A protein has these predicted regions:
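Conserved GNAT acetyl-CoA-binding A-motif
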Residues: 92, 99-112
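Acidic/histidine-enriched, beta-strand-rich ligand/metal-binding domains
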Residues: 74-75, 83, 117-121
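Conserved acetyl-CoA pyrophosphate-binding loop and the N-cap/start of the following alpha-helix
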Residues: 82, 86-94
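Conserved short alpha-helix immediately C-terminal to the canonical SAM/SAH-binding motif I
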Residues: 91, 115-118
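Conserved catalytic-core motifs of GNAT/GCN5-like acyltransferases
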Residues: 110, 120, 125-144
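Short amphipathic alpha-helix that is part of the acyltransferase structural core
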Residues: 1-44, 49-57, 150
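Conserved beta-strand in the GNAT
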Residues: 51, 57-65, 72-77
Length: 150
């Protein structure tokens, strides 16, 4: 098996990213917020959406928003049929490595309550880092942090 994390670049990449987000993060009944494929945050300076591929098949998504030595991981999802099979940890490890490569020392995330256990197992800690973030899609999320480089 060949795994790769790639920044979203091509029209096919954008389509795959939107498909995964819509099916996993914005599934009917999950949020009252509708998905916006043209949300400006995906293309804002310092924000990079990524896809996790297995043998060229897109399986996961995450966006890394760089804020100096801090990175915020957003919109993390693994396709339904690959969940609970280690792909989330693989995506987490790839994002950590990419963040380190970019000079990020601390990662933060607004974790969905049902994902907190996953993040704890991956070495993250619960830490309130910006309560003003906990609105909209992040309402009800648990803020977490991980130091990835001393």
């Amino acid at each position: 098996m060949s795994y790769e994390l790639r920044a979203v670049m091509t029209p096919d990449d954008w389509r795959a990213m939107h498909d995964i987000r819509q099916k996993v993060l914005f599934a009917p009944g999950r949020h009252s917020i509708s998905y916006d494929e043209n949300h400006p945050d995906d293309r804002a300076d310092g924000n990079t959406p990524f896809l996790l591929f297995e043998n060229e098949e897109p399986l996961g998504v995450a966006r890394l928003d760089e804020r100096g030595e801090t990175g915020i991981v957003r919109l993390v999802a693994i396709v339904q049929h690959k969940q609970r099979k280690g792909y989330g940890l693989r995506l987490n490890n790839f994002i950590e490595a990419e963040a380190r490569r970019r000079g990020v020392r601390i990662l933060r995330v607004n974790a969905a309550p049902d994902a907190v256990g996953f993040y704890l197992k991956a070495g993250w800690s619960e830490k309130l880092w910006d309560p003003t973030e906990l609105v909209g899609l992040a309402q009800g999320a648990i803020q977490m942090e991980k130091v990835i480089c001393e």
